[in-house]
């Protein structure tokens, strides 16, 4: 195959920044959601660590999402993207990304009130994990569905995005677990 016919991806810095930060934030929310939904009740100051991780993930996701506006042609019209959620992966990603902040904030309030082990906290945490997974999958589908970029139209795109989010979100989770075990 002729080299001239191969199209390479040359994403803008804002796309890389968005993908990295938001992926890490949503990945951390996925891990936290799974840990709280299916793990043992928090002990000692563990709930405080979870609160800090929830906030850290929220900041990473929010900054990443704001970075996504940098590569829009007309950022002031970004709100219109939400109206196309039935047909657009970009719109679905936006709706789900914003929806993730609702259970994250609710979980933060439950943990702050000392209710980190009750059924409500576990249900909200499970919802956060599911919404986080769905958001990352929608992000991947944006690139997997772009016909002009053949590199994105590969069966490994969605699993790759999910794996990247879980790995980058898992790093702060592992660090926190290390501090918890040492303390």
Regions found by a protein language model. Give the residues of each.
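Long, contiguous internal "core" modules enriched in hydrophobic/ aromatic residues
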Residues: 6, 13, 18-23, 40, ...
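Alpha-helical transmembrane segments of polytopic integral membrane proteins
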Residues: 27, 31, 66, 72-75, ...
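N-terminal signal-anchor module of multipass membrane proteins
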Residues: 3-58, 62
């Amino acid at each position: 195959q002729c080299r001239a016919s191969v199209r390479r991806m040359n994403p803008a810095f804002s796309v890389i920044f968005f993908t990295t930060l938001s992926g890490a934030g949503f990945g951390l929310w996925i891990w936290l959601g799974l840990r709280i939904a299916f793990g043992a009740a928090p002990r000692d100051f563990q709930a405080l660590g979870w609160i800090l991780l929830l906030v850290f993930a929220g900041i990473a996701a929010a900054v990443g999402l704001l970075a996504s506006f940098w590569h829009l042609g007309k950022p002031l019209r970004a709100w219109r993207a939400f109206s196309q959620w039935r047909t657009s992966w970009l719109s679905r990603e936006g709706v789900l990304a914003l929806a993730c902040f609702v259970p994250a904030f609710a979980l933060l309030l439950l943990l702050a009130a000392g209710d980190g082990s009750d059924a409500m906290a576990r249900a909200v945490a499970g919802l956060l994990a599911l919404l986080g997974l769905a958001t990352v999958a929608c992000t991947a589908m944006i690139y997997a569905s772009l016909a002009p970029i053949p590199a994105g139209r590969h069966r490994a795109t969605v699993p790759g995005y999910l794996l990247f989010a879980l790995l980058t979100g898992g790093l702060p989770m592992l660090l926190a677990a290390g501090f918890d075990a040492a303390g």
